[in-house]
């Protein structure tokens, strides 16, 4: 039977083969006509690459079928050098867990009453439990930006 092989250049080759012929035999016939070594040939039929050991009948290739010939690509990505670090890696900070850390925000006076040491932010967007940072001249909320500035005695505004 006769089959067609279409190359990348658009040229069509006709080959005389049998359905019992292997893909190796077809590649050898293409080498005779075109001079392309079989190890560089890739034959494609119906969107599938044809494997060397199988026959034309395995792929249901009938008379006047067209195979597409493409060349095998050699090589791959460029080899990269392994990165060498001049400085040692920075050691990450480890979080120190302190048991009952919330006790530092409260004080119990002589009568047994609990008193807050830090000012809680009154803004509704912050919610309960958001304390304001205590600076030398002001209280500041880091979440919403609310600031209370202390009035200095003897200075009129």
UniProtKB/Swiss-Prot annotation:
Domain of life: Eukaryota
Chain residue numbers at which the record places covalent cross-link Glycyl lysine isopeptide (Gly-Lys) (interchain with K-? in acceptor proteins): 76
One Pfam assignment: Ribosomal_S27
UniProt record similarity statement: In the N-terminal section; belongs to the ubiquitin family. In the C-terminal section; belongs to the eukaryotic ribosomal protein eS31 family.
Record's GO cellular component terms: cytosol; cytosolic small ribosomal subunit; Golgi apparatus; nucleus
Signal peptide: none
InterPro entries: Ribosomal_eS31, Ribosomal_eS31_euk-type_sf, Ribosomal_zn-bd, Ubiquitin-like_dom, Ubiquitin-like_domsf, Ubiquitin_CS, Ubiquitin_dom, Ubiquitin_ubiquitin-like
Extra remark: Ubiquitin is encoded by 16 different genes. Ubiquitin is generally synthesized as a polyubiquitin precursor with tandem head to tail repeats. Often, there are one to three additional amino acids after the last repeat, removed in the mature protein. Alternatively, ubiquitin extension protein is synthesized as a single copy of ubiquitin fused to a ribosomal protein (either eL40 or eS31) or to a ubiquitin-related protein (either RUB1 or RUB2). Following translation, extension protein is cleaved from ubiquitin.
Keyword annotations from UniProtKB, A to Z: Cytoplasm, Isopeptide bond, Metal-binding, Nucleus, Ribonucleoprotein, Ribosomal protein, Zinc, Zinc-finger
Protein name per the record: Ubiquitin-ribosomal protein eS31x fusion protein
C4-type zinc finger locations on the chain: 121-144
Entry's Gene Ontology molecular function annotations: mRNA binding; structural constituent of ribosome; zinc ion binding
Classification lineage: Eukaryota, Viridiplantae, Streptophyta, Embryophyta, Tracheophyta
GO biological process: translation
